[in-house]
Design a protein with these regions (language model features):
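Short alpha-helical segments that sit at the start of domains
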Residues: 1-16, 126
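Short helix-coil-helix linker/hinge
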Residues: 10-13, 26, 92
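Short, cationic-aromatic polyanion-contact patches
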Residues: 10-13, 63-82
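Pre-recognition alpha-helix immediately N-terminal to the DNA-recognition helix
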Residues: 15-20, 31
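Short acidic, hydrophobic short linear motifs in intrinsically disordered regions
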Residues: 26-36
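Short, hydrophobic-biased segments on the C-terminal half of alpha helices
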Residues: 49-50
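Glycine-centered, phosphate/nucleic-acid-interacting loop/turn motifs that mediate DNA/RNA or nucleotide
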Residues: 56
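Amphipathic alpha-helical dimerization/coiled-coil segments
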Residues: 79-126
Length: 127
């Protein structure tokens, strides 16, 4: 029976682990463990990789005595899913409310918003 990918966003730790795998392509538990800062126990990394595999974010192949993990989702797709999840949970599904919140909180100003609008319009005009 195939695995149904979980569309939910990644936790902070899951994202850190996925970033290691996106950067390296294919990794063993030990290789992921070596790249993580601060360091985590081997069993913690192994558990997290297994969770990501069950969620459908990773696949694994047995090579010798070790599993090799690789991503089944691109970084861009994961970012999109995480952003969609954030917008749904925090802004009632409204991307407009996200932008208004950024403006209200001073995290983006009118000038930057105008620049982003120009970039959006340029992209929309391209076939």
């Amino acid at each position: 029976m195939g695995k149904t990918p979980n569309k939910a966003g990644l936790t902070r730790l899951e994202l850190r682990i996925m970033q290691v795998i996106w950067k390296s392509g294919r990794c063993t538990v030990s290789a992921v463990q070596e790249e993580l800062e601060p360091p985590l126990a081997y069993t913690t990394v192994q558990t997290m990789l297994n969770i990501l595999e069950r969620k459908g974010k990773l696949k694994r192949e047995l090579r010798g005595r070790a599993y090799i993990y690789s991503a089944t989702i691109t970084e861009a797709k994961a970012l999109g899913q995480g952003l969609r999840d954030l917008i749904d949970r925090m802004f009632g599904g409204s991307s407009e409310e996200l932008v208004m919140s950024l403006l209200r909180n001073g995290q983006i100003d009118a000038k930057k918003l105008a620049e982003l609008t120009d970039r959006f319009n340029q992209k929309a005009r391209k076939p």
